[in-house]
A protein has these predicted regions:
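Soluble-to-membrane junctions at the N-terminal ends of transmembrane alpha-helices
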Residues: 63-95, 144, 159, 165-167, ...
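Non-lumenal N-terminal regulatory segments of integral membrane proteins
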Residues: 1-167, 173-176, 181-189, 194-202, ...
Length: 921
């Protein structure tokens, strides 16, 4: 870094420090002052901002967008496409060619004359730089645009009060300082906010502080703290609501939040994944080969030919030919094309590099709801303790579901819908929302597994209404409502209740219990401690019908090597019944209580043969996923609830749906627009196709370059002249690379996508060693035929190159040598293109190419066009300018059998490789 850049960096760092200090002061003011003062300072009220206030706040404080990765400017993207080690080599070659082919002849230096002036080489090299750079720029721009469009399809929203207490749902990016936001379980905190009102609000700040335990947030004014994260009345962007609900006012947005300052401080290029590291490792292996080969070729050519300048030019050309300059572009194009294809299958990719992991999944862990079932919950029965339909049970359930302000799940919606359907037939259900007012609420959490609302009617009677999982409800009930009124909840009554519930579970119903307590008298605010001595009044039986497509989807996943495991919080009986209905064979089932008594080693053994895990907590789901990964599996977890977020983060790839809670979407790598296993199966197939085409190019490039090394080394040592001019090698390399650009659109054999594919960089090395040298055999054969047969026969009248000096002299000798070399170079030029290009069709499939497996039309068209262009060049004026001599017809009588033999040998080696290693790609 120079002095000017250093000064700029120091100034920018100082500016960021000043900005962060200002934000800290704003947060400190909000935390340590009464709510009234905070609202006044932010120029807002509890009624929310009006449009003018929103505009003013946005103009003053900016948008709520966080800089996760710095987007490159057009200039930087152009520089990235044109300025890299590969184009640097080309520029170096262009400079040297300018000096030797233009400057020296112009100045008549080192024996050159003005007649030797030639700008063709320089023009071709610069044209190649332009074409390759432009191609890479266009493809990378398209990839970036495709990724942005896909991400734009995923919307994360928040609920705010605006314009006279009207609640509206807005995109999180549109949030401004002073907005009044409403938070509930499952929400991501949309900005740095000051809590105004909260009910049992617990927030996870693990992403900011590393603290795993949720922290309770309250609206109470705080004393000054050493660290802003210690304030219990401030919730920060990047954290999420674990349980409870709250109203808050936005203090800081976007990059000015604590999370934003951390994200922008480390923003830059995307972090390398294991896949990108593997691709880079292959690139560096090839570059190291090149770095070893180029000096060898340079010294051998210089010593044997005596022309060190030509040797230097040839060495640089070899460097270009052996370097996989198109690899980054091909990989990027494959990923972008895969992402677009997956979007057509209702699958949105948040991170392009996760596509490879998606195709590698061999175990899919998923919740039952919405996956095995239709995610259309219907309240079938509202039963009293005797098992009879009872309107009073439905009425209490409605009061609980309607007035709760946390995450509204499908069962709450089913209760409200059922009440609205039956209110016309039963006057006791009319106008419940108007006849009662909410007093308080104890939100749901996954430890208690129940939710409580406190309501009051117009006569002043207060009721605490609680609903939740049956066992957890029984633990807080001491009475039950029977025929003769309220009775103690004896063991006999408890057994009768559990039997009724078991019968419903066996039929596939999900059952919740409902209880109430009249005129409760809490000490202070209502809390969990008040959930006691309640009266059980009945239960609610819900049906979530199984999906008709589930059985086919699970079979399709199994046919593609993916084992489905169910990880659910529901009880075992309901889960077993649903699995039976959809045709999912349950070999073994483990409950959350079983996991608590198992060591990691015991669970690792049991998990392999267990198809269903039931009654799991969120942490237990994450533990199962982690254990399966430690067993060597690539694990995907599909979920949409707050209880799934931990497991999604623990998985190799998290999968969610567009309707999921914020924290689930934030944790996901892949988002489905439709929660269906069949959609997921199609996405996995697209992931495998994408990986297949990437690994094809990587192995093609590696093996082809490795074979070329042997050919060039032998030619440098044995021939009295260069086997190809530097410009020939560069031009050949460009046309070959252009013919490979269609590989992302190639067909993939059904057998390849039938099972998971893990990225394995080590397989590239073995493939390179097995397949690469094959082409060298036929290169050597071409050397022999061109040097000893075709050139003497059609150029020098039967005289070999080394004997020309004995038969010719002066200008005649120079002309004859140029003709001899021109035909030799044309012969190897054409043979190289044929062998190098046709091997694409050999390597792309373990089957017989053109017969059992055909490449896509774009691949076939580009490769054949490349062959045709380079075959014709020696017969054109352009070829003459390059120094080529037209090839005789007899050459093609040799070339065609030679290439056919090459294809036969390559196919045989390919079969042997598959027998030895089990697979080709």
């Amino acid at each position: 870094m120079n002095k000017k850049e250093n000064r700029i960096a120091v100034r920018q760092a100082a500016e960021k420090t000043v900005i962060r200090d200002e934000q800290n002061r704003r947060i400190e003011f909000a935390a340590t002052n009464p709510i009234k003062e905070v609202l006044k300072n932010l120029h807002t009220t509890l009624r929310g901002l009006d449009p003018g206030g929103v505009f003013t706040s946005h103009a003053k404080y900016g948008s709520n967008k966080v800089t996760h990765e710095k987007k490159k400017s057009l200039a930087k993207r152009l520089a990235g496409a044109f300025i890299n080690p590969f184009t640097a080599i080309l520029f170096c070659l262009a400079v040297v060619s300018t000096i030797t082919d233009m400057v020296f002849p112009y100045l008549s230096l080192f024996g050159s004359t003005p007649e030797d002036f030639d700008c063709l080489t320089v023009v071709i090299i610069l044209t190649m730089v332009f074409i390759s750079g432009t191609l890479r720029f266009v493809q990378e721009s398209r990839s970036g645009n495709a990724a942005e469009k896909l991400l734009a399809m995923i919307t994360t929203t928040c609920t705010v009060t605006r314009k006279d207490q009207v609640k509206v749902e807005i995109p999180m990016d549109d949030l401004v300082v002073g907005d009044i936001v409403h938070l509930s379980a499952g929400d991501m905190i949309p900005a740095d906010v000051r809590i105004l009102d909260a009910k049992d609000l617990f927030v996870s700040q693990a992403s900011l502080t590393g603290e795993s335990e949720p922290i309770e947030k309250t609206p109470n004014v705080s004393a000054v703290k050493d660290s802003i994260t210690d304030y219990t009345n401030i919730a920060f962007m990047g954290s999420n609501v674990v349980s409870g609900s709250a109203t808050a006012v936005v203090v800081c947005v976007g990059d000015n939040t604590l999370f934003g300052s951390m994200a922008s401080a480390v923003a830059g290029e995307a972090v390398e994944t294991s896949f990108t590291k593997g691709v880079n490792a292959v690139s560096w292996v090839l570059i190291r080969f090149m770095l070893v080969m180029v000096p060898l070729v340079f010294f051998i050519s210089g010593i044997t030919k005596g022309d060190w300048l030509d040797a230097f030019l040839f060495g640089i050309s070899i460097a270009v030919g052996l370097t996989p300059e198109m690899l980054p572009m091909i990989v990027t194009t494959c990923l972008a094309k895969g992402a677009v294809s997956m979007s057509k299958e209702q699958t949105i990719v948040k991170n392009l590099n996760s596509i490879q992991n998606f195709g590698a999944i061999d175990i899919l862990c998923t919740d039952k709801t919405g996956t095995l079932t239709q995610d259309k919950v219907v309240l079938e029965y509202h039963l009293n303790i005797k098992g009879e339909d009872d309107t009073r049970v439905l009425r209490h359930a409605y009061l609980n579901s309607y007035f709760q302000t946390g995450y509204t799940n499908l069962m709450d919606l089913a209760i409200i819908q059922k009440t609205e359907e039956e209110e016309a037939a039963d006057s006791r259900l009319l106008d419940l929302s108007e006849n009662y007012v909410k007093v308080d609420e104890i939100p749901f959490d996954f430890t208690r597994r129940r939710l409580t609302t406190v309501v009051q009617d117009k006569q002043g009677k207060t009721q605490m209404v609680t609903k939740g999982a049956v066992e957890e409800m029984l633990s807080v009930c001491t009475f039950a409502e029977c025929d003769d009124g309220v009775e103690p909840l004896t063991d006999e009554v408890r057994s009768r209740i559990l039997k009724t519930v078991d019968d419903l579970n066996d039929k596939g119903f999900r059952v919740l219990a409902i209880a109430q307590k009249s005129n409760p008298s809490p000490v202070g605010a209502f809390g969990v401690k008040d959930e006691c001595d309640m009266v059980l009044i009945g239960y609610l039986a819900f049906l979530d019908p199984p999906k008709e497509s589930t059985a086919d989807a699970i079979k399709a996943l199994k046919d593609h090597g993916v084992t489905t495991k169910i990880l659910t919080g529901d009880n075992d009986k309901v889960t077993r019944t649903i699995c039976k209905q959809v045709g999912l064979k349950v070999r073994n089932m483990l409950l959350g209580s079983d996991l608590d008594n198992m060591s990691d080693a015991e669970l690792a053994r049991a998990a392999e043969s267990t198809d269903v895990f039931a009654k799991l907590t969120p942490d237990q789901k994450a533990r199962v996923v982690s254990i399966l990964r430690e067993n060597g599996h690539t694990v995907g977890f599909m979920g949409d609830g707050i209880n799934d977020a931990a497991a999604m983060k623990a998985a190799d790839i998290g999968i969610s749906v567009d309707t999921a809670v914020d924290v689930a979407k934030e944790s996901a790598d892949i988002i489905l627009l439709e929660k269906d296993l069949m959609v997921l199966e199609q996405g996995i197939i697209e992931g495998r196709k994408t990986y297949a085409n990437m690994i094809k190019y990587i192995k093609m490039t590696a093996s082809s370059n490795f074979g070329n090394m042997f050919s060039v080394l032998a030619a440098s040592a044995l021939l009295p002249f260069l086997p190809m001019m530097s410009v020939h090698l560069i031009f050949l390399n460009l046309i070959y690379d252009l013919s490979c650009t269609a590989i992302p659109w190639d067909n993939v054999d059904e057998e390849f996508i039938a099972k998971p594919r893990k990225w394995d960089a080590s397989s590239v090395g073995s493939f390179m060693i097995w397949i690469g040298p094959t082409s060298s055999i036929f290169d050597f054969t071409t050397y022999i035929f061109m040097y000893f047969v075709f050139c003497p026969m059609f150029v020098s009248g039967g005289v070999l190159f080394n004997d020309l000096a004995a038969h010719y002299s002066g200008a005649g000798l120079a002309a004859m040598q140029a003709q001899y070399i021109g035909m030799f170079q044309a012969g190897w030029f054409v043979e190289s293109m044929w062998s190098q290009t046709l091997v694409i069709h050999m390597i792309r499939t373990p089957k017989l190419p053109f017969i059992q497996s055909r490449a896509s039309a774009p691949v076939t068209l580009l490769t054949m066009t490349g062959i045709a262009i380079l075959t014709v060049i020696p017969f054109t004026v352009f070829g003459t300018a390059l120094g080529f001599v037209a090839l005789p017809a007899m050459y093609f009588a040799y070339l065609i059998p030679c290439i056919l033999l090459y294809m036969v040998l390559a196919t045989s080696l390919k079969k042997a490789y598959v027998r030895h290693y089990g697979e080709l790609l």
